[in-house]
Amino acid sequence: MKKVVLLSLCFLFFVVFCSSKAFAIDLYGFGSYWDQDDTEGTWGGGIGLNIQLFTEHLRLDGRAYLFEDNDIGHDGDLSITPFDLGLQVHILPSATVDPYILGGVSYIYADSDRFEVDSTVSGYVGIGLDVNLGIPLVKLFGEAIYRAAELDRKIGEDIDASGFTGNVGLKLLF
């Protein structure tokens, strides 16, 4: 239920605050690796949507990840699913190679079958690069993101899920 409410609020935010003269939408999918401090790194993927705000340099960005379960030793597996909402500032939006910075907030849904853990809100910052492939409406992108996140356990030590995330994928431009 929390996921549905969060995604509905994100969608409403996109609709209300995304009025620009050239309404540009990017849909994208990506592969991802998240190297966390207290758990083993994990592979996953995700989907996202970003919308131009006020100028071609500023974009509102929303994304959802799906990672495989994290092995945390004798305590079993931990399932972590981040939902991000943030901004991207593109340096050279019309160039073949467009560097950008990004940052925002994340709702991190956490679950384990062996212990109780609370989901949390955290933040992230990063850099990215869009590369025009010469194919109409398609771009390749890569990102390096640092996510600060600590998950509260009911019993025992908290889990520090902070760490770097690398994303590589394709954007479809509309």
Predicted features, each with a name:
Residues 17-24:
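Sec/Tat signal peptide C-region and signal peptidase I cleavage site
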Residues 161-174:
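Outer-membrane beta-barrel "beta-signal"
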Residues 138, 142, 147-152, 157:
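Outer-membrane beta-barrel porins/channels
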Residues 1-4:
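Positively charged n-region of N-terminal signal peptides that target proteins for export
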Residues 8-16:
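Bacterial N-terminal signal peptides
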Residues 34-43, 72-77, 112-118, 154-160:
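Solvent-exposed loop/turn segments connecting transmembrane beta-strands
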Residues 48-123, 131-140, 172:
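Gram-negative (and chloroplast) outer-membrane scaffold detector with strong preference
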